[in-house]
Design a protein with these regions (language model features):
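Iron-sulfur cluster-binding cysteine motifs and their immediate structural context
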Residues: 22
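Cytosolic eukaryotic protein kinase-like domains
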Residues: 25, 29-150
Length: 150
């Protein structure tokens, strides 16, 4: 959406309600009602739309939509998947989330699940690092979705 479309499309409502898995566990983004084309040569001002708790903080202040708003929402979704619930207040505990990836993995995991194997733990830590990098306060410090998908 961000890199393969011209002009780029910003979804503006990436959340656990707008992503479904198919039978092969491949994710599909739904609900493009709030999507917006990003025009490089004009203002990308936007009204505030999206699901509470997933909206990038800068959108509330600047009302300017960028691809990095979707990246932030994706970071929230990643942590929600790992934790088993929306990270909510957990996000406000850390001024710079990417510097706190040294958190104990068991503090982040869904407590309803069994302790994962070492291989799975390594993958979960990688996912946490990606999720935290997507939540950087400065939108320019967030990765692109193209980098996230690698």
């Amino acid at each position: 959406m961000h890199n393969d479309c011209s002009p780029p499309i910003v979804h503006r409502d990436i959340s656990s309600k707008s992503v479904l898995l198919d039978l092969e566990y491949e994710a599909h983004v739904l609900d493009f009602e709030t999507a917006k084309f990003i025009k490089q040569d004009s203002s990308n001002w936007s009204e505030l739309v999206g699901t509470y708790g997933y909206v990038a903080p800068e959108l509330a202040y600047t009302m300017t939509i960028t691809e990095k708003c979707d990246v932030y929402s994706f970071g929230v979704l990643v942590l929600e998947i790992i934790r088993g619930n929306h990270p909510g207040d957990f996000l406000s505990l850390f001024p710079s989330l990417s510097s706190n990836v040294n958190l104990v993995l068991t503090d982040m995991l869904d407590p309803r699940l069994a302790t994962p194997s070492h291989d799975v733990q390594d993958k979960l830590i990688s996912m946490m690092e990606v999720g935290f990098s997507c939540l950087e306060a400065n939108p320019e410090s967030r990765p692109t979705m193209q980098i996230v998908c690698q």
